[in-house]
Protein backbone atom coordinates (compact mmCIF):
# COMPACT_ATOMS: atom_id res chain seq x y z
CA UNK A 1 0.00 0.00 0.00
CA UNK A 2 1.30 3.41 -1.02
CA UNK A 3 1.42 5.86 1.93
CA UNK A 4 0.93 9.63 1.48
CA UNK A 5 1.69 11.90 4.44
CA UNK A 6 0.11 15.26 5.21
CA UNK A 7 1.61 18.50 3.92
CA UNK A 8 0.84 21.90 5.46
CA UNK A 9 0.17 25.04 3.40
CA UNK A 10 3.35 26.74 4.63
CA UNK A 11 5.61 23.93 3.41
CA UNK A 12 3.58 23.55 0.20
CA UNK A 13 4.68 27.02 -0.95
CA UNK A 14 8.25 25.75 -1.42
CA UNK A 15 7.40 22.51 -3.28
CA UNK A 16 8.80 21.76 -6.72
CA UNK A 17 6.64 20.15 -9.39
CA UNK A 18 8.14 16.74 -8.61
CA UNK A 19 7.53 17.16 -4.87
CA UNK A 20 3.91 18.11 -5.55
CA UNK A 21 3.40 15.04 -7.72
CA UNK A 22 4.95 12.75 -5.11
CA UNK A 23 2.72 14.17 -2.37
CA UNK A 24 -0.65 14.57 -4.11
CA UNK A 25 -0.81 12.74 -7.47
CA UNK A 26 -1.63 9.01 -7.60
CA UNK A 27 -0.49 7.92 -11.05
CA UNK A 28 -0.84 4.11 -11.18
CA UNK A 29 -4.12 2.88 -9.71
CA UNK A 30 -5.26 0.55 -12.48
CA UNK A 31 -3.26 -2.48 -13.59
CA UNK A 32 -4.83 -5.57 -15.14
CA UNK A 33 -4.95 -8.44 -12.66
CA UNK A 34 -3.89 -6.29 -9.71
CA UNK A 35 -5.15 -4.28 -6.73
CA UNK A 36 -3.42 -0.98 -5.94
CA UNK A 37 -4.16 1.11 -2.85
CA UNK A 38 -2.98 4.53 -1.69
CA UNK A 39 -3.38 5.58 1.96
CA UNK A 40 -3.66 9.31 2.68
CA UNK A 41 -3.07 10.67 6.17
CA UNK A 42 -5.64 13.37 5.38
CA UNK A 43 -8.72 12.00 7.18
CA UNK A 44 -7.27 8.47 6.72
CA UNK A 45 -8.82 8.14 3.25
CA UNK A 46 -7.76 5.21 1.07
CA UNK A 47 -8.22 5.26 -2.70
CA UNK A 48 -7.52 2.32 -4.95
CA UNK A 49 -8.07 0.47 -8.18
CA UNK A 50 -8.86 -3.18 -8.93
CA UNK A 51 -8.84 -4.62 -12.47
CA UNK A 52 -9.76 -8.32 -12.31
CA UNK A 53 -8.96 -10.30 -15.44
CA UNK A 54 -9.28 -14.10 -15.57
CA UNK A 55 -9.15 -14.37 -11.77
CA UNK A 56 -11.15 -12.52 -9.13
CA UNK A 57 -9.34 -10.09 -6.82
CA UNK A 58 -9.99 -10.06 -3.07
CA UNK A 59 -9.84 -6.86 -1.02
CA UNK A 60 -6.87 -7.41 1.28
CA UNK A 61 -6.00 -5.24 4.29
CA UNK A 62 -2.33 -6.05 3.99
CA UNK A 63 -0.03 -4.99 6.82
CA UNK A 64 -0.65 -1.23 6.77
CA UNK A 65 -4.06 -1.25 8.50
CA UNK A 66 -3.09 -3.58 11.37
CA UNK A 67 -6.57 -5.14 11.30
CA UNK A 68 -7.80 -8.67 10.63
CA UNK A 69 -9.63 -7.56 7.47
CA UNK A 70 -9.98 -4.39 5.41
CA UNK A 71 -13.45 -3.29 6.52
CA UNK A 72 -13.05 -4.13 10.21
CA UNK A 73 -13.11 -0.40 11.02
CA UNK A 74 -13.80 1.05 7.59
CA UNK A 75 -16.52 1.63 4.99
CA UNK A 76 -16.06 1.44 1.23
CA UNK A 77 -17.37 2.93 -2.00
CA UNK A 78 -16.82 1.08 -5.29
CA UNK A 79 -17.43 2.72 -8.68
CA UNK A 80 -16.95 0.78 -11.91
CA UNK A 81 -15.36 2.83 -14.70
CA UNK A 82 -14.75 -0.09 -17.08
CA UNK A 83 -16.51 -3.16 -18.48
CA UNK A 84 -19.22 -5.12 -16.71
CA UNK A 85 -18.27 -6.92 -13.53
CA UNK A 86 -19.39 -8.08 -10.11
CA UNK A 87 -18.56 -7.31 -6.52
CA UNK A 88 -19.18 -10.06 -3.97
CA UNK A 89 -19.75 -8.95 -0.38
CA UNK A 90 -20.05 -11.93 1.94
CA UNK A 91 -22.57 -14.24 0.23
CA UNK A 92 -24.18 -11.49 -1.89
CA UNK A 93 -23.04 -10.66 -5.43
CA UNK A 94 -23.76 -7.29 -7.03
CA UNK A 95 -23.69 -6.76 -10.81
CA UNK A 96 -21.99 -3.51 -11.79
CA UNK A 97 -21.95 -1.79 -15.17
CA UNK A 98 -19.92 1.31 -15.99
CA UNK A 99 -20.59 4.22 -13.60
CA UNK A 100 -22.57 2.11 -11.12
CA UNK A 101 -21.70 2.66 -7.45
CA UNK A 102 -21.74 0.20 -4.55
CA UNK A 103 -21.52 1.18 -0.90
CA UNK A 104 -20.14 -1.51 1.45
CA UNK A 105 -20.63 -1.00 5.17
CA UNK A 106 -18.23 -1.60 8.03
CA UNK A 107 -17.73 -5.16 9.26
CA UNK A 108 -17.90 -7.06 5.97
CA UNK A 109 -14.98 -9.49 5.99
CA UNK A 110 -15.11 -10.80 2.42
CA UNK A 111 -15.12 -8.44 -0.60
CA UNK A 112 -14.14 -9.75 -4.03
CA UNK A 113 -14.02 -8.16 -7.49
CA UNK A 114 -14.56 -9.98 -10.81
CA UNK A 115 -14.97 -9.13 -14.50
CA UNK A 116 -17.61 -10.61 -16.79
CA UNK A 117 -15.24 -10.56 -19.78
CA UNK A 118 -11.43 -10.58 -19.31
CA UNK A 119 -11.11 -8.94 -22.74
CA UNK A 120 -13.15 -5.98 -21.47
CA UNK A 121 -12.41 -6.05 -17.74
CA UNK A 122 -14.18 -4.06 -15.10
CA UNK A 123 -12.13 -1.24 -13.61
CA UNK A 124 -13.19 -0.73 -10.02
CA UNK A 125 -12.28 2.54 -8.32
CA UNK A 126 -12.25 2.20 -4.53
CA UNK A 127 -12.64 4.86 -1.84
CA UNK A 128 -12.55 3.95 1.87
CA UNK A 129 -12.81 5.97 5.08
CA UNK A 130 -12.78 5.03 8.74
CA UNK A 131 -16.21 4.22 10.21
CA UNK A 132 -17.61 4.10 13.74
CA UNK A 133 -21.07 2.89 12.67
CA UNK A 134 -22.33 0.22 10.31
CA UNK A 135 -24.68 1.04 7.42
CA UNK A 136 -26.17 -1.52 5.00
CA UNK A 137 -24.48 -2.41 1.74
CA UNK A 138 -26.37 -0.83 -1.15
CA UNK A 139 -26.05 -0.65 -4.94
CA UNK A 140 -26.73 2.58 -6.87
CA UNK A 141 -26.93 1.93 -10.63
CA UNK A 142 -26.19 5.02 -12.70
CA UNK A 143 -29.65 4.75 -14.28
CA UNK A 144 -31.28 5.23 -10.88
CA UNK A 145 -29.02 8.08 -9.73
CA UNK A 146 -30.52 11.58 -9.55
CA UNK A 147 -28.72 13.90 -12.02
CA UNK A 148 -28.20 17.60 -11.33
CA UNK A 149 -27.45 19.89 -14.29
CA UNK A 150 -25.10 22.80 -13.63
CA UNK A 151 -23.07 25.34 -15.60
CA UNK A 152 -23.38 26.48 -19.20
CA UNK A 153 -21.62 26.29 -22.55
CA UNK A 154 -20.83 30.00 -22.28
CA UNK A 155 -18.86 29.32 -19.08
CA UNK A 156 -17.28 26.13 -20.52
CA UNK A 157 -18.59 24.15 -17.53
CA UNK A 158 -21.83 22.54 -18.71
CA UNK A 159 -21.92 19.40 -16.58
CA UNK A 160 -24.07 16.77 -14.88
CA UNK A 161 -23.47 15.79 -11.26
CA UNK A 162 -24.52 12.42 -9.87
CA UNK A 163 -24.53 12.14 -6.09
CA UNK A 164 -24.26 8.54 -4.89
CA UNK A 165 -23.32 8.54 -1.21
CA UNK A 166 -24.56 11.56 0.73
CA UNK A 167 -27.09 12.72 3.29
CA UNK A 168 -30.10 12.32 1.00
CA UNK A 169 -28.83 9.27 -0.90
CA UNK A 170 -26.99 6.16 0.26
CA UNK A 171 -26.24 6.58 3.95
CA UNK A 172 -22.68 6.22 5.20
CA UNK A 173 -20.70 7.00 8.30
CA UNK A 174 -18.62 9.80 6.76
CA UNK A 175 -17.99 9.09 3.07
CA UNK A 176 -19.54 11.37 0.45
CA UNK A 177 -19.08 10.23 -3.15
CA UNK A 178 -20.34 11.38 -6.53
CA UNK A 179 -19.43 11.80 -10.17
CA UNK A 180 -19.34 14.77 -12.54
CA UNK A 181 -19.61 14.43 -16.34
CA UNK A 182 -18.64 17.38 -18.52
CA UNK A 183 -20.40 17.82 -21.86
CA UNK A 184 -18.35 17.99 -25.09
CA UNK A 185 -16.54 21.32 -25.55
CA UNK A 186 -16.75 21.98 -21.80
CA UNK A 187 -13.53 21.81 -19.81
CA UNK A 188 -13.80 23.58 -16.43
CA UNK A 189 -14.72 21.99 -13.10
CA UNK A 190 -15.26 23.57 -9.68
CA UNK A 191 -14.76 27.16 -10.81
CA UNK A 192 -15.50 29.46 -9.03
CA UNK A 193 -13.44 27.50 -6.53
CA UNK A 194 -14.31 26.63 -2.95
CA UNK A 195 -12.79 25.27 0.24
CA UNK A 196 -14.10 22.93 2.93
CA UNK A 197 -11.66 23.04 5.81
CA UNK A 198 -13.57 20.30 7.61
CA UNK A 199 -13.11 17.68 4.87
CA UNK A 200 -10.43 16.47 2.49
CA UNK A 201 -11.31 15.39 -1.03
CA UNK A 202 -9.95 13.11 -3.73
CA UNK A 203 -10.57 13.40 -7.47
CA UNK A 204 -10.23 10.61 -10.03
CA UNK A 205 -10.11 11.89 -13.62
CA UNK A 206 -11.12 9.46 -16.36
CA UNK A 207 -12.93 9.11 -19.74
CA UNK A 208 -9.95 10.96 -21.24
CA UNK A 209 -8.15 10.30 -24.53
CA UNK A 210 -4.49 9.31 -24.43
CA UNK A 211 -3.26 12.69 -25.68
CA UNK A 212 -5.50 14.88 -23.48
CA UNK A 213 -4.65 16.33 -20.09
CA UNK A 214 -6.31 18.06 -17.15
CA UNK A 215 -4.56 20.95 -15.42
CA UNK A 216 -5.64 20.56 -11.79
CA UNK A 217 -5.28 23.66 -9.62
CA UNK A 218 -4.57 23.39 -5.92
CA UNK A 219 -3.16 25.35 -3.00
CA UNK A 220 -4.53 28.16 -0.87
CA UNK A 221 -6.49 30.71 -2.93
CA UNK A 222 -3.72 33.30 -2.71
CA UNK A 223 -0.94 30.78 -3.55
CA UNK A 224 -2.10 28.36 -6.26
CA UNK A 225 -0.15 25.71 -8.17
CA UNK A 226 -1.12 23.09 -10.75
CA UNK A 227 -0.65 19.40 -11.57
CA UNK A 228 -0.83 17.98 -15.11
CA UNK A 229 -2.95 14.83 -15.04
CA UNK A 230 -3.49 11.93 -17.44
CA UNK A 231 -6.44 9.58 -17.81
CA UNK A 232 -7.29 7.48 -14.73
CA UNK A 233 -5.02 9.37 -12.37
CA UNK A 234 -6.16 10.66 -8.97
CA UNK A 235 -5.42 13.75 -6.90
CA UNK A 236 -5.43 14.02 -3.10
CA UNK A 237 -6.75 17.44 -2.09
CA UNK A 238 -5.98 18.73 1.43
CA UNK A 239 -8.72 20.54 3.40
CA UNK A 240 -6.86 23.86 3.04
CA UNK A 241 -6.62 23.63 -0.76
CA UNK A 242 -8.84 24.61 -3.63
CA UNK A 243 -9.51 21.79 -6.12
CA UNK A 244 -10.38 22.88 -9.62
CA UNK A 245 -9.39 21.81 -13.09
CA UNK A 246 -9.48 22.58 -16.79
CA UNK A 247 -8.95 20.02 -19.53
CA UNK A 248 -7.72 20.06 -23.10
CA UNK A 249 -11.01 18.24 -23.79
CA UNK A 250 -14.03 17.18 -21.75
CA UNK A 251 -13.68 14.43 -19.13
CA UNK A 252 -15.41 12.77 -16.18
CA UNK A 253 -14.27 12.77 -12.57
CA UNK A 254 -15.27 11.04 -9.35
CA UNK A 255 -15.14 13.15 -6.20
CA UNK A 256 -14.96 11.65 -2.74
CA UNK A 257 -14.84 13.38 0.64
CA UNK A 258 -14.23 12.33 4.23
CA UNK A 259 -13.86 14.21 7.48
CA UNK A 260 -16.11 16.27 9.70
CA UNK A 261 -19.73 17.19 8.89
CA UNK A 262 -21.96 15.37 6.44
CA UNK A 263 -23.51 18.16 4.40
CA UNK A 264 -22.69 18.53 0.72
CA UNK A 265 -23.19 22.31 0.88
CA UNK A 266 -20.73 22.79 3.77
CA UNK A 267 -18.19 24.77 1.75
CA UNK A 268 -16.69 28.25 1.61
CA UNK A 269 -16.82 29.88 -1.82
CA UNK A 270 -13.67 31.62 -3.02
CA UNK A 271 -14.24 34.89 -4.90
CA UNK A 272 -12.39 35.29 -8.21
CA UNK A 273 -10.50 38.33 -6.94
CA UNK A 274 -9.00 36.17 -4.16
CA UNK A 275 -7.30 33.76 -6.57
CA UNK A 276 -3.64 34.26 -7.35
Curated annotation (Swiss-Prot):
Concerning CDD domains, the annotation shows: cupin_KduI_C, cupin_KduI_N
Kindly list the positions annotated as binding Zn(2+): 194, 196, 201, 243
Give the EC number: 5.3.1.17
Q: Which InterPro entries match?
A: KduI, KduI/IolB_isomerase, KduI_N, RmlC-like_jellyroll, RmlC_Cupin_sf
Cofactor note as given: Binds 1 zinc ion per subunit.
Annotated pathway: Glycan metabolism; pectin degradation; 2-dehydro-3-deoxy-D-gluconate from pectin: step 4/5
Q: Which cofactor does it need?
A: Zn(2+)
Which top-rank group of organisms is this from? Bacteria
Matching entries from NCBIfam families are given as: PRK00924.1
> Briefly, what is this protein's role?
Catalyzes the isomerization of 5-dehydro-4-deoxy-D-glucuronate to 3-deoxy-D-glycero-2,5-hexodiulosonate.
Protein name as catalogued:
4-deoxy-L-threo-5-hexosulose-uronate ketol-isomerase
Species classification: Bacteria, Bacillati, Bacillota, Bacilli, Bacillales
The encoding gene is kduI
Amino acid sequence: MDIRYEVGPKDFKTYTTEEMREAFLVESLFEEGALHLSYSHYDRLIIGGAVPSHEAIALDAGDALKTDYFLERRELAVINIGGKGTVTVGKDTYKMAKRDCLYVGRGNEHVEFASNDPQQPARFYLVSATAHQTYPTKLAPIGEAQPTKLGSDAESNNRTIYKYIHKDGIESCQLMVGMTLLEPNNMWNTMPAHLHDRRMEAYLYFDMEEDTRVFHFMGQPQETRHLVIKNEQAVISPPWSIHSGVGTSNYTFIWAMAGENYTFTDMDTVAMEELK
